[in-house]
Swiss-Prot record:
One of its GO terms (molecular function) is metal ion sequestering activity. It is found in: Cell membrane; Secreted, Cell wall. One of its GO terms (biological process) is cellular detoxification. Pfam families: CYSTM. Belongs to the CYSTM1 family. The keyword Transmembrane helix applies. The chain crosses the membrane at residues 24-40. The keyword Secreted applies. PANTHER family: CADMIUM TOLERANT 3, PROTEIN CADMIUM TOLERANCE 1. It comes from Digitaria ciliaris (Southern crabgrass). One of its GO terms (cellular component) is extracellular region. This is Protein CADMIUM TOLERANCE 1.
Length: 55
């Protein structure tokens, strides 16, 4: 028999959505902004999360 595949990590967007559900919109937006600050660039995924985290 085959073993089950290893669990997959959450995508960045899913991680932001989880933060939004657990801690609220403000926390999710700050979390997303700090990610861009730490990697010194603004990626498209970060912008999508910032624009949509309060929806």
């Amino acid at each position: 028999m085959y073993n089950a595949p290893p669990p997959q990590d959450m995508s960045y967007y899913e991680h932001c959505q989880k933060r939004h559900e657990e801690k609220g919109c403000l926390y999710a937006c700050i979390f997303t902004a700090l990610c861009c600050f730490c990697c010194y660039e603004t990626c498209e995924c970060c912008l999508d999360c910032l624009c949509c985290c309060c929806n």
